[in-house]
């Protein structure tokens, strides 16, 4: 069940990376990018904790937030 939920959560991220991201300028302040971070977090920690980590990261990605190298814990 967790594998199916992870797959469902990853589909919109892959769609964003393939179809939307190429049409917009790079804007992520972190390395790896927020979408790559979300993929890694969901694959490493599962759908629940991975989604939590991804949302936290996306909320930190703004002009007044941090920047630089921020790997998945």
Curated annotation (Swiss-Prot):
Alphabetical keyword list: Cell inner membrane, Cell membrane, Membrane
GO cellular component terms, A-Z: plasma membrane
Entry-linked Pfam families: YidD (PF01809)
Keyword check for Cell membrane: yes
Main location as per UniProt: membrane
InterPro entries on file: Membr_insert_effic_factor_YidD
Compartments, as annotated in UniProt: Cell inner membrane
Keyword field contains Cell membrane: yes
Topology with respect to the bilayer: Peripheral membrane protein
Source superkingdom: Bacteria
UniProt family annotation: Belongs to the UPF0161 family.
Biological role: Could be involved in insertion of integral membrane proteins into the membrane.
The protein's name in its UniProt record: Putative membrane protein insertion efficiency factor
High-level lineage: Bacteria, Pseudomonadati, Bacteroidota, Bacteroidia, Bacteroidales
């Amino acid at each position: 069940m967790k594998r199916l939920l992870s797959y469902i959560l990853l589909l919109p991220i892959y769609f964003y990376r393939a179809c939307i991201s190429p049409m917009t300028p790079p804007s992520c302040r972190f390395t790896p990018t927020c979408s790559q971070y979300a993929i890694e977090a969901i694959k490493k920690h599962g759908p629940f904790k991975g989604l939590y980590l991804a949302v936290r990261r996306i909320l930190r990605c703004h002009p007044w937030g941090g920047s630089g190298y921020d790997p998945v814990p």
